[in-house]
Amino acid sequence: MGHNLVAVQSLQRSLLTPTIGFIRKRHVQPGQRLTTMNARAETVGQLRTYKSAWAKSQLYLVPMLRFFEPNWEQPTHVRWSIGMATGEPFAVASLYREWEEENGKKSFSFTQLTISADDHPFMNRFHRPDEEKRSLVIIPSSDYDEWLGCKNPERARTYLQPYPAELMAGQPAPKVAAPMQNELF
């Protein structure tokens, strides 16, 4: 099942179900490893993978209740669930790409935009101690229409800001092992 995205098409919001990862796996050359789940805001307009979509302002929002990041404040990492302090849904800035499939139908894929979180009072707690800290870009709900309708890449860049730490919350959320098949308890 894909993720729902919100986009503006013909001056109306549309809900699509694209796949995560900007380059669909079937379009990656055998033996090539290409990770496109996230795109760095600092280079999204320069990298060949994203340059065209960024120039065309193919901007989307990915609605979420939470996302997960590894916290390394202990000797071994602990998965954390991160969301709004209010528990309300929010949306993350993303970039989409349209594909024409062999059957002639259109499909969509997306990448989430990230920014440095080295100086963020909350998001700097995540990822390995020796790695750069990154965060998804949360777009305030008051800016949804402006983000989705933005047709100027430099103006779009002004939305790629750290979200206020005091409006965010997180807690440990270790993965629960799935029960083995054919077991009742």
PLM region spans:
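Tight coil/turn sites that cap or link beta-strands
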Residues: 65-66
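C-terminal accessory segment of soluble enzyme catalytic cores
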Residues: 105, 117-185
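Short, His- and charge-rich active-site/binding loops that engage polyanionic ligands
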Residues: 1-59, 83, 104-105
